Amino acid sequence: MADGFSLNDALAGSGNPNPQGWPGAWGNQPGAGGYPGASYPGAYPGQAPPGAYPGQAPPGAYPGPTAPGAYPGPAPGAYPGQPGASGAYPSAPGAYPAAGPYGAPTGALTVPYKLPLAGGVMPRMLITIMGTVKPNANRIILNFLRGNDIAFHFNPRFNENNRRVIVCNTKQDNNWGREERQSAFPFESGRPFKIQVLVEADHFKVAVNDAHLLQYNHRMKNLREINQMEISGDITLTSAAPTMI
C-alpha cells in the first residue's frame, strides 16, 4: 500500500506487538488506558516516563487530579463534557477512541443521520459508528459526500437475490461507477455492530466488530471536499463520531 503499512500491520491478531502507530491492532481496542500513539499504557503522546505529563514529577499523574492517571474533569477517567461516564475516553481500561476531541452524541440518533466532517476527511481520521441492526433488515448505507456526489458508498445488503453482499461504489455527476462487491458479511439482523472507517492517503479501510473487512481506493482525490457522511438503512443508531489517530 502507498502509505507503507502492510496488511499484517493492519489486521487484528497480526502478531505485531506495535503495529506502527495504530491504536492497538487495526480494528481492535488499545491496551488498558492507552492513548492513541502513546508509547506507554496511559501515556499522553510524546511522553518519556510512563504516564507522566511533560515536566511533571509523579509518574502517572495528569496535572491537577487527586488520583494518579485521572483526566481533568468532574469524574476520574471521564472526558471533559462527559461527567461520570463509565468507560470514558481516554483513561478508562480498554476504552476505544470513539469520541475523540469531537465528542460523541448519546442516545438513539435519528436515521437518516448526517455527520458533518468540518474541513473534509484526511489521512488518519477514524470514524466510528455504533448501533444495532433491526430485525428483518434489508440494508445499511454509509455515504461519504462531496456535495451531491458520493465519494464512498458502503452498502451491506441482507437479501439481494437471496444472498448477503456488501457493495461499494462512487457516484459522480449523477453517474455510478463500477461496483466493488464483498462476500464477507459480518452483520446480523437484531445484533449490535461497530463500524470503523479509517481514512488513508489513497484509500478507505473498513473494520466491523473489531475485524478488518475491506479496503476501497479513493476515486475522488480531493479529500478535503468530502465533508459529510450520511448514515441510513435498517438500523438503530447510537453514536457516530470522528477522531484522529
UniProtKB/Swiss-Prot annotation:
SMART domains: Gal-bind_lectin (SM00908), GLECT (SM00276)
Compartments, as annotated in UniProt: Cytoplasm; Nucleus; Secreted
Domain of life of the organism encoding this protein: Eukaryota
Motif annotated as Nuclear export signal, chain positions: 221-236
Gene Ontology terms, MF aspect: disaccharide binding; IgE binding; laminin binding
Residues at which a beta-D-galactoside binds: 176-182
Pfam families tied to this protein: Gal-bind_lectin
Keyword Secreted: yes
Keyword line: Acetylation, Cytoplasm, Differentiation, Disulfide bond, IgE-binding protein, Immunity, Innate immunity, Lectin, mRNA processing, mRNA splicing, Nucleus, Phosphoprotein, Repeat, Secreted, Spliceosome
Modified residues annotated as N-acetylalanine in this record: 2
GO cellular component, one term: immunological synapse
Protein name: Galectin-3
Organism name: Cricetulus longicaudatus
Organism placement in taxonomy: Eukaryota, Metazoa, Chordata, Craniata, Vertebrata
